[in-house]
């Protein structure tokens, strides 16, 4: 299983330096959607990481993806949300609510 990444230039450089090879540097929501779809259709990819800000612009693409997509903060910090998507993923997968 490999990890795919969709992010801006700073995120892409960071993950490449960490040794990941399936890294897409995007500049628009359209590019991000296309990259997510390509990674989602790649049988070797098991997890996709993107930034919260990119995720905000491609919510429908993320909702339709078959793979697990984790949104991480970018260099500007986290987006304050009413519901934490990671907590929702864990609750749905494990059945336990994280406090």
From Swiss-Prot:
Query: What keywords would UniProt list here?
Result: ATP synthesis, Cell membrane, Hydrogen ion transport, Ion transport, Membrane, Transport
| Subunit note | Has multiple subunits with at least A(3), B(3), C, D, E, F, H, I and proteolipid K(x).
Keyword Membrane attached:
yes
- Reading the lineage from the top rank, the first entry is Archaea
Q: List the disulfide bonds.
A: none
Name of the gene this protein is made from: atpF
The main place the protein resides is membrane
Subcellular location(s): the record lists:
Cell membrane
Q: Which GO terms describe its molecular function?
A: ATP binding; proton-transporting ATP synthase activity, rotational mechanism; proton-transporting ATPase activity, rotational mechanism
Say which species the protein is native to.
Answer: Methanococcus vannielii (strain ATCC 35089 / DSM 1224 / JCM 13029 / OCM 148 / SB)
Taken from the record, one Pfam family name reads ATP-synt_F
Q: What is this protein called?
A: A-type ATP synthase subunit F
What does the entry give for GO biological process?
Answer: proton motive force-driven plasma membrane ATP synthesis
GO (cellular component) term, any one: plasma membrane
